[in-house]
Amino acid sequence: MQEDSKVYDITVIGGGPVGLFTAFYGGMRQASVKIIESLPQLGGQLSALYPEKYIYDVAGFPKIRAQELVNNLKEQMAKFDQTICLEQAVESVEKQADGVFKLVTNSETHYSKTVIITAGNGAFKPRKLELESAEQYEGKNLHYFIDDLNQFAGRRVAVLGGGDSAVDWALMLEPIAKEVSIIHRRDKFRAHEHSVENLHNSKVNVLTPFVPAELVGEDRIEQLVLEEVKGDRKEIIEIDDLIVNYGFVSSLGPIKNWGLDIEKNSIVVKSTMETNIEGFFAAGDICTYEGKVKLIASGFGEAPTAVNNAKAYMDPKARVQPLHSTSMFEK
């Protein structure tokens, strides 16, 4: 296992929207910041589940696409040189005798003066395709996450799933891919009615009610064999890529073993956003307090509170109330 011996001022666990804003704000307070994210990309559920959906309750935006909001947050954070660690799930956090936190992930050990957890509903993993041969194609042309739509340009793509994410991906891929098919085990899709209407009015090949039965190909998937649910029909389609979108399973997992005060699967915090462990803060949907409302907008307010109090924890002489951002950037 690798070890990064550098001790950061703030380590943010979770790279969703609140985590990204937390990292930006940490930079504003001149803190060294590291983000640890379990998924292959930043953006959390916004990027992984509904990148094309509009969000209407972020201040200053009448409406904004989820992925556009993530892109804006990444651009905002890029003002500072933050360290980003992807595909690392934090397994344990321990406050050592010297007050420094030791964070152990599935692949690396990290050290930090303070920790701010912004992990939403906890770590979430994709529901995987339950076919015997599926695992051998992961990392090749079987995908659970999509980082760049352009990688599918001119290719034949099949999407498995019937929810919002599956329908969104199929519609987004239609103008880019050579051919798009969506396969769902039921005749009716669970996605938003407007999205389903757009799907049926598109050139996407809709195959229902079918389930995947076999993946054919040596090094990569070349054919997808489908079987009709409660029927005898079979379909074989030639594909270059398979995207599985069966949803995600989220849980606090090992977070429950870190000594934090947890109430109804949320971490209890004070008005400073500090947990029962000094120097360990939480913001966003992962935390709870009296009157807590779980919204992205709320998390954006909690992030500066957590950062400013983390700064004061590290340096008692530091101002909890910061300067206005205009005085910091406009010189």
UniProtKB/Swiss-Prot annotation:
EC number: 1.18.1.2
Cofactor(s), by name: FAD
InterPro entries recorded: FAD/NAD-bd_sf (IPR036188), FAD/NAD-binding_dom (IPR023753), Fd--NADP_Rdtase_type_2 (IPR022890), Ferredoxin-NADP_redctase_2 (IPR050097)
Keywords noted in UniProt: FAD, Flavoprotein, NADP, Oxidoreductase
Gene3D superfamilies in UniProt: FAD/NAD(P)-binding domain
Catalysed reactions, semicolon-separated: 2 reduced [2Fe-2S]-[ferredoxin] + NADP(+) + H(+) = 2 oxidized [2Fe-2S]-[ferredoxin] + NADPH
Free-text comment on the cofactor: Binds 1 FAD per subunit.
GO molecular-function terms, A-Z: ferredoxin-NADP+ reductase activity; flavin adenine dinucleotide binding; NADP binding
Superkingdom of source: Bacteria
Positions that bind FAD: 37, 45, 50, 90, 124, 285, 326
Pfam families given in the database record: Pyr_redox_2 (PF07992)
Complex formation: Homodimer.
Family: Belongs to the ferredoxin--NADP reductase type 2 family.
The protein's name in its UniProt record: Ferredoxin--NADP reductase 2
Species this protein is from: Bacillus velezensis (strain DSM 23117 / BGSC 10A6 / LMG 26770 / FZB42) (Bacillus amyloliquefaciens subsp. plantarum)
